[in-house]
């Protein structure tokens, strides 16, 4: 009896740690943050690092405002207005307004970056994120696609495309991004936010959109 209780207590502790870890991974690799991280990587590892520090900072602040701050603010207002929790907002039929807010914000950012003549390969990051949002919104009526999985897949697809454009060996980075994508999908599955089918479709949409936008823009 004592051993059984001890085993149950350890099992509950293990499950709680697993859920907590999944929540942290899900938060750190939110689809809202990935465009900012990708843009920052371009400012460091491409010829854009020759820009003045103030210019790079202003570009990052601009991207942050339109991909994180504004969407989060308006989605928060929408959720509070309806009295929903984050989990309740995640229901498939309630995701259209958050999608519309994100798409409008990303489209505005894309227009601004085009207006200030940002290089095409940098525009491709925002275009990829925008196209992922659009495709996920279109298929939302039939399938609750995971935007976390789609965003992580977009990073993988974009990396493959940049490897072709700049002719570098992406093996190490590709392994890392695939591993991170797997971590994100596992976290969403553990939290019971999505099924394996929804996660798989999300990754597939992300890879295709990320790759095509970088190649063709």
Tell me what each language-model feature is.
Residues 52-69, 92-93, 203:
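Loop-to-helix transition at the N-terminal end of transmembrane alpha-helices
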Residues 45-55, 84-87, 115-116:
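Membrane-interface helix termini and inter-helical loops of multi-pass transporters
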Residues 25-46:
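The first (N-terminal) embedded transmembrane alpha-helix
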Residues 1-22:
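Short, Lys/Arg-rich, polar N-terminal cytosolic tail immediately upstream
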Residues 99-117, 139-141:
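C-terminal halves and exits of single transmembrane alpha-helices
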Residues 119-217:
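Membrane-embedded catalytic cores of phosphoryl/pyrophosphoryl-handling enzymes
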Residues 69-81:
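Membrane-water interface of transmembrane alpha-helices
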Residues 85-101:
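Juxtamembrane helix-capping/reentrant segments at transmembrane boundaries
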């Amino acid at each position: 009896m004592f051993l059984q209780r001890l085993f149950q207590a350890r099992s509950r502790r293990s499950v709680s740690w697993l859920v907590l870890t999944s929540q942290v991974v899900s938060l750190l690799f939110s689809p809202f943050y990935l465009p900012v991280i990708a843009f920052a990587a371009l400012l460091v590892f491409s010829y854009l690092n020759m820009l003045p520090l103030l210019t790079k900072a202003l570009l990052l602040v601009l991207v942050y405002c339109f991909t994180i701050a504004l969407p989060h603010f308006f989605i928060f207002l929408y959720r509070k207005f309806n009295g929903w929790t984050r989990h309740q907002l995640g229901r498939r039929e309630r995701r259209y307004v958050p999608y519309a807010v994100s798409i409008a914000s990303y489209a505005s950012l894309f227009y601004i970056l085009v207006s200030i003549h940002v290089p095409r390969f940098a525009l491709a990051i925002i275009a990829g994120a925008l196209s992922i949002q659009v495709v996920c919104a279109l298929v939302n009526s039939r399938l609750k696609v995971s935007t976390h999985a789609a965003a992580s897949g977009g990073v993988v697809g974009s990396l493959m495309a940049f490897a072709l454009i700049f002719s570098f060996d992406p093996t190490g980075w590709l392994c890392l991004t695939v591993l991170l994508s797997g971590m994100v999908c596992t976290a969403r599955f553990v939290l019971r936010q999505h099924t394996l089918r929804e996660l798989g479709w999300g990754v597939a949409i992300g890879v295709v959109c990320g790759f095509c936008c970088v190649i063709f823009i």
